Amino acid sequence: MQLLTIGINHHTAPVALRERVAFPLEQIKPALSTFKSVFLGHPAPNAPEAAILSTCNRTELYCATDDRAARDAAIRWMSDYHRIPADELAPHVYALPQSEAVRHAFRVASGLDSMVLGETQILGQMKNAVRTASEAGSLGTYLNQLFQRTFAVAKEVRGTTEIGAQSVSMAAAAVRLAQRIFEQVAQQRVLFIGAGEMIELCATHFAAQGPRELVVANRTAERGAKLAERFGGRAMPLSDLPARMHEFDIIVSCTASTLPIIGLGAVERAVKARRHRPIFMVDLAVPRDIEPEVGKLKDVFLYTVDDLGAIVREGNASRQAAVAQAEAIIETRVQNFMQWLDARSIVPVIRHMHTQADALRRAELERARKMLARGDDPAAVLDALSQALTNKLIHGPTSALNRANGADRDSLIDLMRGFYQHAPRSSDTSDH
């Protein structure tokens, strides 16, 4: 069984491409079904195991398969699924086989591959991806084991290193950028669009600045109101956004919409109504919530997740000692997992040996029963049974020894010594 990870992330692709390859939550189960039934075309039980991790910064397909051509086929599947030309997508895709796939999973869950070094959000996102794959019936022995060990490694790394200490989060970076535009965030009106985990983190950081007003707009009014209440703000219907956008100095958006919810025309009208007072906008969604053309407007300062990356990286450099410690832990755990994987490769052989031996046993047992039924001496029947089983069980090894020559024979003899502890050494088999 081969492990394989196919993906793109913030290291290999810009947000303009990442948003085209992202999987909305409701599409993941159907996509996994397509992958299993169409991509490799294998009927159960040989269908590949698969899980999809899709976040703002990465889209990754983890799979376990017997197909040796899985790498190219997986990239082709991703290209076809998202209707992106293969020659456009391929340069940005990484394909990680076996131990590289294991190492990558461990690093991702531990926060070592994140834009925000050591951030914890990715671990929850990976657990959700595994839960979704499990519900879709696309997990099996290999990926289950990979992810269970992945979560254990992440816990070990975070518990024994300082990888997450004093990390500069995306939310904190957004506040820093806002302070470059507005000297006092406390004097500004802030609007959050969405009510998910990222918006909650951003609201926490902006609320700490004591803004003049804090408003949450969300498709689900109840959830938006609950979040706003936590921070002493108020909620507004998302449908009011076009008419009221001009009221806000700072707008932070992160929804699960597959299409932009803030267009160029709406922002142009807001800027005009504000008499060209600046608007600071942060788009943390992938796919993006705000049309990219908005960033070209004179009085609009629009930042995406990639733009916030530079500020985040400034805080990452000081924690390289923790990174080295985490990498050492991960490398040890990768080796442990690969030992388990190697051991799994002999399971089919052992199973076949048991099946074959049991078939021999059943055949000889039936033969012995027939002998007893016709009145043969029980002692003679037992002796014949034991002789027949002995001859058939050692037939394979003795035939292999007889066919072997030279060094191969010596190796086989030494191997047989391990099987049959009292067998003579190969050096003792020559005539004296």
Swiss-Prot record:
Its EC number is 1.2.1.70. The keyword Ion transport does not apply. InterPro entries: 4pyrrol_synth_GluRdtase, 4pyrrol_synth_GluRdtase_dimer, 4pyrrol_synth_GluRdtase_N, GluRdtase_CS, GluRdtase_dimer_dom_sf, GluRdtase_N_sf, NAD(P)-bd_dom_sf, Shikm_DH/Glu-tRNA_Rdtase. It catalyses: (S)-4-amino-5-oxopentanoate + tRNA(Glu) + NADP(+) = L-glutamyl-tRNA(Glu) + NADPH + H(+). Signal peptide: none annotated. NCBIfam families: hemA. Possesses an unusual extended V-shaped dimeric structure with each monomer consisting of three distinct domains arranged along a curved 'spinal' alpha-helix. The N-terminal catalytic domain specifically recognizes the glutamate moiety of the substrate. The second domain is the NADPH-binding domain, and the third C-terminal domain is responsible for dimerization. Homodimer. This is Glutamyl-tRNA reductase. The lineage of its organism: Bacteria, Pseudomonadati, Pseudomonadota, Betaproteobacteria, Burkholderiales.
